UniProtKB/Swiss-Prot annotation:
The active site is at Y39, K94. It catalyses: (S)-malate + NADP(+) = pyruvate + CO2 + NADPH; oxaloacetate + H(+) = pyruvate + CO2. Its cofactor is Mg(2+); Mn(2+). NADP(+) binds at A195, G196, A197, A198, N288, N320. Residues 1-428 are annotated as: Malic enzyme. This is NADP-dependent malic enzyme. The gene is maeB. Residues 429-759 are annotated as: Phosphate acetyltransferase. In the N-terminal section; belongs to the malic enzymes family. In the C-terminal section; belongs to the phosphate acetyltransferase and butyryltransferase family. Pfam families: malic, Malic_M, PTA_PTB. SUPFAM superfamilies: Aminoacid dehydrogenase-like, N-terminal domain, Isocitrate/Isopropylmalate dehydrogenase-like, NAD(P)-binding Rossmann-fold domains.
Length: 759
């Protein structure tokens, strides 16, 4: 490790506070009553319930989402036996990964005990605390004995990740690699370098999936493991000892091998050995940080080889984070008493299948220009693929149920998958009523920036989720090329329609219609013709206006107001409305907050604000939320007579005329809007109850400042929008920072609006 990296790592662990984890309360402790409920005397109630029924611990405590990462520090990474305390940073790091990828809480426990039986007693005594045990960095062969005995004694999952995590990912890689090279697992020969925990676990899984034991040759530090090589050979090694053929070295047995599995050390495999392997060999060189052979060296002599390593700087990284958080997620969610072979195999298959799926936009963004289509350079998913939890956890949970180790079976797997999706997309629960309605009658939605990678990823999502019938504007050759490069599985003419912006035969009709709309706005016929080639938003707008599309989502490129000016000119306002407005939703840990008008009107009049407030309430109801509107100002219920304050008071009067049943009040300060007790101190009889969820600002400046401050102040907050209100057709203008998920969300909203919009 170079000095710069070393110092950066030390600083990372020291500042701003030492370590990487902390305990945060999940219940409020703001009042004396809170304290009485959390501790004495109230805490006695759940204690007595658990005494009557031990399973009640999962209902009243955090046990069901709590895993112990336990180590004695005898085999820490590549550092060896450095002791329990020195291994603590690794155990904390494991805890961070559990939390980050699967929402699982972790206590890291470092046990200063080398005697296996004493270590077992310590861990077994902790069973009442945890929902699962993750054994970490314990040397072989003791790790096999420790895990076996703990599995026998404990009634919660016990999982030695160094064995089974590596085995699960490696096995998934081998299954997919064999599929690429069209070989059968029952026919291939495999040579293994290393006979430690990971290697043995890999072989066990592969045999369970059909690999023949007689086709496996294992080499350890003494050479080939064969029957009779030594007395009292460890059982784990003896299980894979072959008949004595006279061959003693890796170099001798590698000839003709289809697979090399390396769980040993650096530079064990040479180029000369690789040359002797079978057609299209698979090489899993998993030693870290330096593998058994570097991929460029192997490729130099065997360009047909498929290579996996444990490193992130080469394709096909075998990384345990691909599985352990999600295996535990599935096991915990059904109250599994063990992680058995059926659950491991379910994880293998789920991981292997995910590599065949279309690429996630998160992965594409994280890995830049890499080709992430299934093939020799991509046979296992990337660690940052957000879909891992949605694919692996349900598969593991179902396997636990089917194999009889689940104590709390899942009754509704669709609801369970929806819940898991919240780990991937924080907007999932918020958007659920919109998605459900959109699926009932998907509409044609035109996406003018059809060549954009985000739009293409969104199109894939829309098709997968069954939310819409996308129409993309762009050059067909460019769209097809980018779909292939992004590893997507959508097909033009099957999943979506393309409107070629350079040569669509309808363009004469389009520009003629556009000219009729714009001719009194300074647009000539020639300019209208050019708009049909260069202004994709204009093309999409005319398609919606002609009934060739039902809705439009634009704005992922360019300036908001340029897009909006086209939308406003083509569509105008809906009946009974004389203005438009934009609203953004902020999904914060404290609740959902909607802010208007964030984009359209710089200094709206009371009449405009009243229309915006009423339209905002209508939109919020679509999400299944009761609107509670606060009109914000520097003035608090008449404390100022400034023009701004007077404007908001007049707005309130106009809203009450338009929507007398709407829960609304103002003008008020922001804290009064969000905290009922503060509001009641000033206005005890306010009709607004609880925290306001729609904040109507006096002008765009205040709205935009508030929105951006709230957006960046919460690391857990996510946004939806901007939602365009008041236009006669279901159209929304996004901004260039819109994510793929935001595009998907807004398309779904536009579909729901189109379902109720007259043609």
């Amino acid at each position: 490790m170079d000095e710069q990296l070393k110092q950066s790592a030390l600083d990372f662990h020291e500042f701003p506070v030492p370590g990487k984890i902390q305990v945060s309360p999940t219940k409020p402790l703001a009042t004396q009553r809170d304290l009485a409920l959390a501790y004495s005397p109230g805490v006695a109630a759940p204690c007595l319930e658990i005494e009557k029924d031990p399973l009640a611990a999962y209902k009243y405590t955090a046990r069901g989402n709590l895993v112990a990462v336990i180590s004695n520090g005898t085999a820490v990474l590549g550092l060896g036996n450095i002791g329990a305390l020195a291994g603590k940073p690794v155990m904390e790091g494991k805890g961070v990964l559990f939390k980050k990828f699967a929402g699982i809480d972790v206590f890291d426990i470092e046990v200063d005990e080398l005697d296996p039986d004493k270590f077992i007693n310590v861990v077994a005594a902790l069973e009442p605390t945890f929902g699962g045990i993750n054994l970490e960095d314990i040397k072989a062969p003791e790790c096999f004995y420790i895990e076996q005995k703990l599995r026998e004694r404990m009634n919660i999952p016990v999982f030695h990740d160094d064995q089974h995590g590596t085995a699960i990912i490696s096995t998934a890689a081998i299954l997919n690699g064999l599929r690429v090279v069209e070989k059968n697992i029952s026919d291939v020969r495999m040579v293994v370098s290393g006979a430690g925990a990971a290697a043995i676990a890999c072989m066990n899984l592969l045999v369970a999936l059909g690999m023949q034991k007689h086709n496996i040759v294992v080499c350890d530090s003494k050479g080939v493991i064969y029957k009779g090589r030594e007395p009292n050979m460890a059982e784990t090694k003896a299980a894979y000892a072959v008949d004595d053929s006279g061959k003693r070295t890796l170099d001798e047995v590698i000839d003709g091998a289809d697979i090399f599995l390396g769980c040993s050390g650096p530079k064990v495999l040479t180029q000369e050995m690789v040359k002797k392997m079978a057609r299209a060999p698979m090489i899993l060189a998993l030693a870290n940080p330096e593998p058994e052979i570097l991929p460029p060296l192997a490729k130099e002599v065997r360009p047909d080889a498929i290579i996996c390593t444990g490193r992130s700087d080469y394709p096909n990284q075998v990384n345990n984070v691909l599985c352990f958080p999600f295996i535990f997620r599935g096991a915990l969610d059904v109250g599994a008493t063990a992680i058995n072979e059926e659950m491991k195999l379910a994880a293998v298959r789920a991981i292997a299948e995910l590599a065949h799926a279309e690429q996630s936009e998160v992965v594409a963004s994280a890995y830049g220009d890499q080709d992430l289509s299934f093939g020799p350079e991509y046979i296992i998913p990337k660690p940052f693929d957000p879909r891992l939890i949605v694919k692996i956890a349900p598969a593991v949970a179902k396997a636990a149920m089917d194999s009889g180790v689940a104590t709390r079976p899942i009754a509704d797997f669709d609801a369970y998958i929806d819940k898991l999706t919240e780990f991937v997309y924080k907007t999932n629960l918020f958007m659920k009523p919109i998605f459900s309605q959109a699926r009932k009658d998907p509409k044609r939605v035109v996406l003018p920036e059809g060549e954009e990678a985000r739009v293409l990823h969104a199109t894939q999502e829309l098709i997968t989720l069954g939310l819409a019938k996308p129409i993309l504007i762009g050059r067909p050759s460019v769209i097809e090329m980018r779909i292939q490069k992004l590893g997507l599985q959508i097909k033009a003419g099957v999943d979506f329609e393309i409107v070629n912006n350079e040569s669509d035969p309808r363009f004469k009709e389009y520009w003629s219609e556009y000219y009729q709309i714009m001719k009194r706005r300074g647009i000539t016929q020639e300019q209208a013709q050019r708009a049909m080639i260069g202004n994709h938003t204009a093309i999409g707008a005319i398609m919606v206006q002609r009934g060739e599309a039902d809705a439009m989502i634009c704005g992922t490129i360019g300036d908001y107001h340029e897009h909006f000016s086209v939308v406003k000119a083509v569509f105008g306002y809906r009946d009974g409305v004389h203005t438009a407005g934009a609203m953004n939703a902020l999904l914060l840990p404290s609740g959902n907050t909607f802010i208007a008008d964030t984009y359209v009107n710089e200094d709206p009049t009371p009449e405009q604000l009243a229309e915006i407030a009423v339209m905002a309430a209508e939109t919020v109801r679509r999400f299944g939320i009761e609107p509670k509107v606060a009109l914000l100002s520097h003035s608090n219920f008449g404390s100022s007579n400034s023009l701004s304050a007077s404007k908001m008071r007049e707005t309130l009067e106009r809203v009450r005329e338009r929507a007398p049943d709407l829960m609304i009040d103002g003008e008020m300060h922001g804290d009064a809007a969000l905290v009922e007790s503060i509001r009641n101190d000033r206005m005890p009889d306010s009709p607004l109850k609880g925290a306001a969820n729609i904040l109507v600002m006096p002008n765009m400046e205040a709205a935009r400042i508030s929105y951006n401050l709230l957006r960046v102040s919460s690391s857990e907050g996510v946004t939806v929008g901007p939602v365009l209100m008041g236009v006669s057709k279901p159209v929304h203008v996004l901004t260039p920072i819109a994510s793929v998920r935001r595009i998907v969300n807004m398309v779904a909203l536009a579909v729901v609006e189109a379902q109720t919009t007259p043609l």
